[in-house]
Amino acid sequence: MIEEIDNINKILKEDLLTTIQKGSKISIAASCFSIYAYQELKKVLEEIDELRFIFTSPTFIVEKADKEKREFYIPRLNRERSLIGTEFEIKLRNELTQKAIAKECADWIRHKVQFKSNCTNQNMVGFGVVDNTVYTPLNDFTIVDLGIEKGNNAYTKIYKLGLPFSTSNL
């Protein structure tokens, strides 16, 4: 089974709400994680067994770079700040619910989530796996990639693949 998700005719959030089940095991590789994406999927994410998340670029790691190289680490800081919302989620940050969402998300993370970071200089393509279903490519875990807000991309093409394609991404 191969389906195309364009976030116009078929929205990733809606598809995930039907794909994620109680006891699901999820793996995500993406450049950033947003508490607002968690909020949109909270109902189903609270019921999963586990989520393994890997940042596709070095994020939340201790710097060991020379002083001359540090000036080029601004994108990493932006990825880390995206935890509390990207530039497209400003409207949500202004609703004064950020503290409550962050607390709920932190509690959920403590019980069900493992975070890791790609600490190499090698590129990783983002994807998401829910049990036996893979979504690829997946750039970020934000409301833009979920199809709730419009981002800077001219178009979105996420492919939903079932068995046997999904097992190679675990």
Language model features by range: what are they?
Residues M1-L170:
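PLD/PLD-like phosphodiesterase catalytic module centered on the HKD motif
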